[in-house]
């Protein structure tokens, strides 16, 4: 490889590195939330959680449909010693016997949810060949058999599945939207953390430039004895502190930018510039409406309903199992046996089966009764927990909506305070330059401006955090008055 090639490779690598390091994007709040829901690792995790629940429900629905099964045993060889009667010696003797067999069958089954029984249709064919002293070949067929098996007094799982499984899937869908709004809430938090860091950094830069200018002015005024030595040292201290603040703000900015880039699954070298949202439109949310939406949409309510149903199912199961159990199996069909395959299906004979089995617990030392009492007590616990969760959620919705409605007024107040603080600082700075304001007044004015800037960004952050938290708790978009479920495509897991 010649030097030109080496130089070219190095140049390309440096170009790629510089291009990567200087990659920059500009994001507003809406775009940040979209990227979070499309690209973040949290969004991928929640999407796969939804798909897991989706396929679980599909499996439940498939189990309600007829199933067709083929059972095959292509070959079985069996060699053994058996006892046989020898007519020549009039005594039993042991003989070696060999057997080869094969079987196949088709079975159609359909569960019947109302009674918990199972309908079935079978068709079987078996082949048997014996070797040894006794040689024979037989085909046994069951061309057709239809039957029904049913637990007469037992637990019916199908009936409870019809109540629980659709509720579970509805909960999974609502959880998906809930977690999507949770990702949006996280995105808002990361966005404003970076916004606060950028504002701090910008203020630190301006403060650094301002303190440097003021210190230079102070030096000139000190030479003509316009300010004291103590005031000059204070200006110098402000300059040093401003430089330290700038360095700390730069570190905090890098951390906040890296955190947002990582959350959005971007390259860690991405430079992010934020477009801050302005004052949001005035919107008042009714606490009663938010509570009603939460009770009908929040997945935590559905989860508590699921827990209550599952506990009631366990009570029913243990109560039924504490008594005797009886089951019925009835079938009618045809069968035949012959030495060859064709005759095995010729003139089949009718085959009938009716069986009733009963299982009666006599002595179990209170095991069944104990299980039933445990299930009943657990049902009471679940109902109490469901009520506690309901009260907790009602409190959370009420407080969040109240904070949101107040936060809109706080944004207007914080914006007004920021404008006043900026004007006050500029006037104090000009008065200091012409010698009509002291250092303490200037420092106090600067601190007030910085505090007002932080309060304004914090007010915006709290507003949007509360807004998306309300969306998460209610699964409702109050801005467009639409349910978030109506805007969701559950097949693809994406907003429409």
Question: What do the PLM-derived regions correspond to, one by one?
Answer:
Residues 5, 27, 163-167, 171-293, ...:
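Periplasmic alpha-helical coiled-coil/stalk elements that build and connect Gram-negative outer-membrane
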Residues 22-23, 69-71, 76-81, 268, ...:
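Acidic, low-complexity, intrinsically disordered peripheral segments
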Residues 98-104, 140-144, 348-352:
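Residues that define the transmembrane beta-barrel architecture of outer-membrane proteins
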